[in-house]
C-alpha cells in the first residue's frame, strides 16, 4: 500500500478545522441517517483513538427568544438516531459550563467531543507504516495512468526534486477528500462536489470546556 500526500500531512483542510467531534445531534432533526452515522463514528474514534479524543460532552441550549417546545422534538430525534440526549436543568448547565449564556432557559447534554486532527492523522499514518504501508509526502498526483479504460496507476510530481514519477498498482483509490473531484476528472468521471470556504475565529486560550450549540 502506498499513500501519496501532496505536501505535509494535515497541511490542507485536515489541519484547518474546529476539531469538533460531532455527536450527530446537530443533524438529528433534519437528517437521521447522517446523525446516526456521525454518532457511530464518534463512538468508534473514542474506542480506537482515545488518545486523540477529549470527551468534553456538549450542550444544546435554548435561549429566551427560542421555542422551548422544540427541545422535546430535538431529544426525540436524537433518541431515534441512537444519540444520548439528556435534558438538564439550566442551573446544572451553568455549573457544568460557566461560560454558557447565563440567560438560557433550557439545555440538553449530548456526547460531543474534541479531536486532535494532527495527532489522529499521524497516528493513522504510523499505524499504516507499522502494517507495511509506505507514505510519500510532497508527491502530488498530476495524472492517472490509463490503458484500455483501466486505471493502472498514477503520475505524481515530487515537489522537492521536481521529478515526475510513475506508480503502478492493482487498485488505485482516490483519497483526495474535498479535492477528489479534481482527481476523478482525470479518469473522465464527474463528481458533483466542490470545496466551500468558511471562517474560524482562533483564540490563544480555551473559552469554554464543553461544546455549545443553540437548540
Identify the meaning behind each predicted range.
Residues 19-92, 96:
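Dinucleotide-binding Rossmann-like beta1-alpha1 core, especially the glycine-rich loop
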Residues 1-17:
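Glycine-rich FAD pyrophosphate-binding loop
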Amino acid at each position: 500500500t502506498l499513500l501519496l500526500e501532496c505536501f505535509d500531512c494535515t497541511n490542507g483542510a485536515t489541519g484547518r478545522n474546529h476539531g469538533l467531534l460531532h455527536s450527530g445531534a446537530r443533524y438529528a432533526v433534519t437528517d437521521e441517517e447522517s446523525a446516526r452515522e456521525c454518532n457511530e463514528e464518534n463512538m468508534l474514534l473514542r474506542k480506537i483513538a482515545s488518545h486523540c479524543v477529549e470527551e468534553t460532552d456538549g450542550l444544546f441550549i435554548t435561549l429566551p427568544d427560542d421555542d422551548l417546545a422544540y427541545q422535546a422534538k430535538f431529544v426525540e430525534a436524537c433518541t431515534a438516531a441512537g444519540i444520548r440526549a439528556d435534558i438538564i436543568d439550566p442551573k446544572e448547565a451553568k455549573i457544568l459550563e460557566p461560560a454558557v449564556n447565563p440567560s438560557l432557559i433550557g439545555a440538553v447534554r449530548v456526547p460531543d467531543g474534541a479531536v486532535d486532527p494532527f495527532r489522529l492523522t499521524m497516528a493513522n499514518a504510523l499505524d499504516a507504516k507499522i502494517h507495511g504501508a509506505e507514505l510519500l509526502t510532497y508527491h502530488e498526483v498530476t495524472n492517472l495512468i490509463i490503458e484500455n479504460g483501466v486505471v493502472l496507476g498514477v503520475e505524481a510530481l515530487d515537489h522537492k526534486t521536481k521529478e515526475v514519477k510513475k506508480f503502478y498498482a492493482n487498485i488505485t483509490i482516490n483519497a483526495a477528500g474535498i479535492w477528489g473531484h479534481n482527481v476523478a476528472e482525470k479518469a473522465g468521471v464527474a463528481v458533483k462536489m466542490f470545496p466551500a470556504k468558511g471562517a474560524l475565529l482562533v483564540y490563544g486560550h480555551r473559552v469554554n470546556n464543553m461544546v455549545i450549540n443553540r437548540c
